[in-house]
A protein has these predicted regions:
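N-terminal amphipathic, basic helical "cap/leader" segment at the start of enzyme domains
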Residues: 1-107
Length: 107
């Protein structure tokens, strides 16, 4: 599934985000939007240049040996069914690799 295009210019500066960062142990029950999920995937491993060699996270020798997976629970992300997803940075898309709410199995 192709993800929505990421935002390059956020609503808050990096400095403000760092200054206002707090640990929260009480979470909202509101599901993430597909746009929010897309932004998280891109920030973790997204392509940051047109040639496709550079990503949002550094990697020695540009090897990028780590893949990004997300386990999505029932009604946790609008537009995604529950299951495990693999993120493909080259196409900025996710693919379902296992169906069902797997949170208890991976927690």
């Amino acid at each position: 599934m192709k993800l929505p295009k990421q935002k390059i210019h956020g609503e808050v500066s990096l400095e403000t985000a760092i200054k206002q960062r707090r640990t929260i142990r009480s979470f909202t029950s509101e599901p993430l939007s597909l746009e929010q999920c897309s932004q998280l995937f891109w920030a973790a491993q997204g392509i940051t240049e047109d040639r496709g060699f550079k990503r949002a996270a550094p990697s020695g020798g540009a090897l990028y040996p780590m893949d990004i997976y997300a386990v999505v629970g029932e009604n946790c992300v609008k537009g995604l069914e529950s299951g495990a997803y693999h993120y493909d940075p080259k196409s900025h898309a996710v693919s379902l690799v296992s169906k069902g709410d797997l949170r208890n199995k991976v927690a």
